[in-house]
């Protein structure tokens, strides 16, 4: 399967650099999986598309201020992007510098270079960094870090991004990118969903910077997926099994919720899905057999990204590419701060030939 089959033309003007003034005020493109039919509306139309007893599964990760600026004590400027927090003293990070720091190198971090750290070891493309500070890592990041806006939002982060680039229900710090489908849910909408009898459950997947890495191979099967930490606790498993038992749908809010639920299903020994705590490298592309989710809320993704492949495996390749073509023609806003889709499962997607 060719990566190029997932390419599409996207005018620069359709990339959203700021969110809508109101979270739930974005547009919603609905794709009916079995028929490919498209419906245009606004995000609050979701209320009419869900039935009492349906289960929404959210990702409650919280974005950390993961981008740090500073310099090596020996001189050169550096930019650090945290991939994950290892413990209260250490991080695993990407480091941009004219010359990569060697183990033992001292780093001066923060806009005022007030934080001292040491590059301890290199792990392939990532650097293990230890802070020489009494405070825990998270406190240091909150003090000196910048919000890690995606590379396609071509502007410096602003104070407002600390809340805007965060879901209203975020709880567990650890992500370096927001689970963006969740950004559209505000408290009034969540309340109306609860009043309608919509069930809610929360997984955790700490989105890594790898989510922005381009696919650098020509053939999809050759791509090596990045690893991210996910948690699917017992209460989520119970909620999923209960929804299935009563004939309701499981609706994933975002591709990270999809990857969490499907990872837990793949690892399950007896039931459809069992609790899961650990790293996942699940790579979902056409031909993948979905086992848990019946519908999906998601944003519009980058051309040739692993996420448009995940959507194609769910909705069908042709349906997905047609929907994206329509979205471009209708001037939908793309990527993290952009508009959303609501997609129901297409059982024919499994047998569809891609690129034909």
Swiss-Prot record:
Catalytic activity: 7-aminomethyl-7-carbaguanosine(34) in tRNA + S-adenosyl-L-methionine = epoxyqueuosine(34) in tRNA + adenine + L-methionine + 2 H(+)
GO biological process, any: tRNA wobble guanine modification
Pathway the protein acts in: tRNA modification; tRNA-queuosine biosynthesis
Keywords of this entry: Cytoplasm, Queuosine biosynthesis, S-adenosyl-L-methionine, Transferase
Domain of life, per lineage: Bacteria
First and last residue of the signal peptide: none
Membrane-spanning residues: none
Transmembrane listed as a keyword: no
GO cellular component, one term: cytoplasm
Molecular-function annotations in GO: S-adenosylmethionine:tRNA ribosyltransferase-isomerase activity
EC number per UniProt: 2.4.99.17
Main location class: cytoplasm
KW Cytoplasm (keyword) present: yes
Location in the cell: Cytoplasm
Matching InterPro entries: QueA, QueA_dom1, QueA_dom2, QueA_sf
Function per UniProt: Transfers and isomerizes the ribose moiety from AdoMet to the 7-aminomethyl group of 7-deazaguanine (preQ1-tRNA) to give epoxyqueuosine (oQ-tRNA).
Quaternary structure and interacting proteins, as annotated: Monomer.
Similarity section: Belongs to the QueA family.
Protein name: S-adenosylmethionine:tRNA ribosyltransferase-isomerase
Organism: Enterobacter sp. (strain 638)
Name of the gene this protein is made from: queA
């Amino acid at each position: 399967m060719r990566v190029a089959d997932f390419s599409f033309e996207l005018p620069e003007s359709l990339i959203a650099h700021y969110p809508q003034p109101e979270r739930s005020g974005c547009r919603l493109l609905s794709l009916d999986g079995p028929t490919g039919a498209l419906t245009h509306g606004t995000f609050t139309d979701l209320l009419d598309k869900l039935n009492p007893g349906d289960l929404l599964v959210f990702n409650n990760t919280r974005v950390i201020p993961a981008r740090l600026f500073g310099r090596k004590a020996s001189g050169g400027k550096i930019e650090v992007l945290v991939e994950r927090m290892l413990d209260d003293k250490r991080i695993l990070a990407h480091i941009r510098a004219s010359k990569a720091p060697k183990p033992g190198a001292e780093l001066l971090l923060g806009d005022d270079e007030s934080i001292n750290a040491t590059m301890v070891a290199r792990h392939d493309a990532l650097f293990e960094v230890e802070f020489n500070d009494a405070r825990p890592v998270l406190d240091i990041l909150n003090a000196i870090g910048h919000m890690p806006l995606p590379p396609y939002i071509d502007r410096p982060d602003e104070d407002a991004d600390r809340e805007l680039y965060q879901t209203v229900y975020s709880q567990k710090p650890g992500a370096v990118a927001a689970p963006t489908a969740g950004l559209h849910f505000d408290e009034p909408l969540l309340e109306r969903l609860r009043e309608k009898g919509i069930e809610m459950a929360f997984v955790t997947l700490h989105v890594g910077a790898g989510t922005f890495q381009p696919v650098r191979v020509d053939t999809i099967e050759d791509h090596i997926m990045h690893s991210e930490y996910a948690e699917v606790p017992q209460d989520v498993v119970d909620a999923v099994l209960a929804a299935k038992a009563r004939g309701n749908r499981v609706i994933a809010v975002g591709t990270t919720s999809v990857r969490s639920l499907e990872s837990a299903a793949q690892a399950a020994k007896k039931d459809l899905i069992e609790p899961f705590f650990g790293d996942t490298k699940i790579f979902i592309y056409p031909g993948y057999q979905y086992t848990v989710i019946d519908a999906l809320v998601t944003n519009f993704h980058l051309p040739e990204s692993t996420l448009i492949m995940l959507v194609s495996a769910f909705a069908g390749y042709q349906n997905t590419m047609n929907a994206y073509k329509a979205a471009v023609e209708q001037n939908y806003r793309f990527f993290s701060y952009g508009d959303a889709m609501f997609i129901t499962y297409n059982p024919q997607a499994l047998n569809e030939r891609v690129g034909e």
